[in-house]
Amino acid sequence: MSAPKKVVLAYSGGLDTSIILKWLQTEYGCEVVTFTADLGQGEELEPAREKAVMLGIKPENIFIEDVREEFVRDFVFPMFRANALYEGLYLLGTSIARPLIAKRLVEIAAQTGADAVAHGATGKGNDQVRFELTAYALDPAIKVIAPWREWDLTSRTKLLEFAEQNQIPIAKNKRGEAPFSVDANLLHTSSEGRVLENPGEEAPDYVYQRTVDPEKAPDAPEFVEIAFEKGDAVAINGEAMSPATILTKLNELGGKHGVGRLDLVENRFVGMKSRGIYETPGGTILLEAHRGIEQITLDSGAGHLKDSIMPRYAELIYNGFWYSPEREMLQALIDKSQEHVTGTVRVKLYKGFARTVARWSEHSLYSEKHVTFEEDAGAYDQKDAAGFIRLNALRLKLIATRNARVKG
């Protein structure tokens, strides 16, 4: 395969991706286009433009985009309709961001006439898979460059030497190795590596950046009401908001009350186990509220089927198959289930917990007259239960009779 002439790089403006940018220029002799996404990570992104210009990137080849609304509307919300949890715990904050970044890389490549895209994911992690599966799903002819799998800059010392040799500025706090690596977006903050690599030791307090220590959270609970339409949150405390604004507000409330902390050892797609500290305050509240509204609006058969496919759906997202036909098939089923998931949920926030305390909906299947302990005015004839039990017990009785006969 011939060397690429123009490459679109997923660029943060940080030291590592700046080194990658210069490496692409020197190793491939190619023109580089940079793409920097505002996913709600809380960083000022204009310095990325300045750094790219300093490294020789043409102004017209610098793309900095606010994709927060698209991220929440088209990726986070569809995933939350499924109540997706990887291995029963992880809310997939990193996993769900990668398809959007990779999609934009491919789109910008088409727009600028680039023949390759590049990312800064290492050869040990899941992100390399997520970026590349998305790229190939959207453009089978695209070339993907993964510098961490190609170069010989295998230590922090070598990276810093390369930076110095190529006049890449190194902030003082980057001279030493960071105690852990951080990835953040509007859904979560994840921390991994170094001081966190021993799963037998509790994570230091300074690792947590988005949530207060639950023990130090306010002593008084706070209540928040979240309104849903067809499975998606549309308002908080009666105020209609955009998807990204809703998640931002829930992050603020959850972080204040220490909601959404997770210390997890997970199974990476590439075969190893890794330990991560995740903070997902708004997402944890949203998941609790969505489950709450489904409790009264979703039929038991549909709900149980939906629950049974959730682990597979979550695994597909974790492993990078957002644009696969099987994920899209499951999404169609999940979205169908949400047609009546409309109503409001009240959630109590208190010292690390988010708990549904009330829910109501015009689409509710909950019938108080059927479940009441008082007189139900003939709504339910308890005698009907006898035949129901006899029919369901028939096969169990036949099995027991057979077993007794065989043993006898």
From Swiss-Prot:
The keyword Secreted does not apply. GO terms for molecular function: argininosuccinate synthase activity; ATP binding. It is an enzyme of class 6 (ligase). Its EC number is 6.3.4.5. L-citrulline binds at Y90, S95, N126, R130, S181, S190, E266, Y278. It catalyses: L-citrulline + L-aspartate + ATP = 2-(N(omega)-L-arginino)succinate + AMP + diphosphate + H(+). Keywords: Amino-acid biosynthesis, Arginine biosynthesis, ATP-binding, Cytoplasm, Ligase, Nucleotide-binding. CDD domains: ASS. Homotetramer. This is Argininosuccinate synthase. It comes from Cereibacter sphaeroides (strain ATCC 17023 / DSM 158 / JCM 6121 / CCUG 31486 / LMG 2827 / NBRC 12203 / NCIMB 8253 / ATH 2.4.1.). The lineage of its organism: Bacteria, Pseudomonadati, Pseudomonadota, Alphaproteobacteria, Rhodobacterales. The gene is argG.
